[in-house]
């Protein structure tokens, strides 16, 4: 593998700064759709995540606040919005839920192959009750079918024989990230996308969602 197309880090960094940096570095995108590299299993509630999926050119209309109502100052603008979250996956071993913030992470490697457009997360983990597993998360966005975002999870149990449950979520009303302390981003949490018609076809979940003001919709 040519080194200039490959980047890898090791270790279970849990700082807020490291997690947000990892979401940026290990994102998946193809020019049409982009997904930040947040952990599939999520973070504890005390951590901030800029969890997001975006479609290029898919926008809504929002008010542009001005200090004064003067002639020539714009009052509305277009804004990109966070579309439905389809990357979240809970992993349960019996009554224990997998998380890098609990138990013991014996090995954590995270990499991105820029030539193939693939990100990998490899983990050797021991649960608080001693269940030992290996996990590999493999993700990519397709350059052949641009709307396609793929996730592959490989799980190997080493000393546990019992129920393993993976719960994949499809959340249709994601909100745009906000941080009142950061002047670079919005200070108010805003929801631009609203789910209209959720339903399932076999193992496939579908959610039709519409923007609040631009009149755009997606499924």
Task: Pin down the residues of each PLM region.
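Beta-sandwich/jelly-roll carbohydrate-recognition scaffolds of carbohydrate-active enzymes
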Residues: 2-219
């Amino acid at each position: 593998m040519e080194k200039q197309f490959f980047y890898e880090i090791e270790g279970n960094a849990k700082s807020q700064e490291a997690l947000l940096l990892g979401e940026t570095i290990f994102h998946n995108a193809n020019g049409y759709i982009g997904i930040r590299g947040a952990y599939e299993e999520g973070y504890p509630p005390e951590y901030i995540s800029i969890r997001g999926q975006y479609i290029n050119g898919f926008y809504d209309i929002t008010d542009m606040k001005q200090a004064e109502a003067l002639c020539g100052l714009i009052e509305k603008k277009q804004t990109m919005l966070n579309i439905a979250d389809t990357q979240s996956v809970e992993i349960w071993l019996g009554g224990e839920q997998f998380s890098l913030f609990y138990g013991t992470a014996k090995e954590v490697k995270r990499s991105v192959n820029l030539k193939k457009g693939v990100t990998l997360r490899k983990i050797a983990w021991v649960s608080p009750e001693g269940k030992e597993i290996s996990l590999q998360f493999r993700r990519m966005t397709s350059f052949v079918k641009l709307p396609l975002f793929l996730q592959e999870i490989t799980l190997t149990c080493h000393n546990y024989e019992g129920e393993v449950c993976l719960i994949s979520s499809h959340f249709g009303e994601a909100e745009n990230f906000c941080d009142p302390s950061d002047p670079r981003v919005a200070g108010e949490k805003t929801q631009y996308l609203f789910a209209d018609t959720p339903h399932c076809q076999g193992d496939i979940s579908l959610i039709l969602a519409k923007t609040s003001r631009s009149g755009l919709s997606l499924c």
